[in-house]
Regions:
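Short connector loops at helix/strand junctions that flank enzyme active sites
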Residues: 17-19, 34, 50-54, 72
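Secreted/periplasmic proteins that engage bacterial cell-wall peptidoglycan
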Residues: 21-35
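Short clusters of hydrophobic/aromatic residues that line enzyme substrate/ligand-binding pockets
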Residues: 36, 70, 96
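Short Fe-S-cluster ligation motifs
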Residues: 56-60, 82-109
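Short, charged surface segments at domain edges that flank catalytic/cofactor-binding sites
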Residues: 1-21, 46-49, 88, 95-96, ...
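Short Cys/His-centered divalent metal-binding micro-motifs
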Residues: 27-30, 43, 54-79
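Histidine-centered catalytic micro-motifs used for acid/base chemistry in nuclease
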Residues: 35-39, 57-58
Length: 109
């Protein structure tokens, strides 16, 4: 595992927790090609960066799909818990909204 990327075990734990779907829109994703989004961004490094509570499975990349939407609309993303403040070391305490399920979740590790 690099400083900014979770190991394969964590990646699969998050993918399975999210039922192989984009956490936001619900699109089914391939276990061989999916993206994880860091709720507290990688540029705000800390020891919990790659914990499951800081990660959600998303469709697209930084330039398309829900992953792009998160970064293009930060105000909405903070409100919906898709982004977490750089000063928050406990993303597990910040509810995250799933649009296709129409509800909030608290993610654990």
């Amino acid at each position: 595992m690099s400083k900014t990327n979770p190991d394969i075990e964590t990646r699969m734990k998050v993918f399975n927790r999210d039922h192989g779907r984009c956490f936001i829109c619900g699109r089914f994703l391939s276990a061989y090609a999916f993206n994880l989004h860091h709720r507290r961004m990688r540029s705000h490094a800390w020891e919990g960066l790659n914990l499951p509570s800081n990660l959600i499975t998303v469709c697209g990349s930084g330039t398309m799909g829900c992953h792009a939407r998160i970064h293009a609309h930060p105000k909405e993303s903070y409100v919906k818990g898709w982004l977490v403040s750089a000063y928050n070391d406990h993303p597990e305490d910040v509810p995250v909204f799933s649009e296709y399920r129409n509800r909030e979740f608290l993610l654990n590790n």
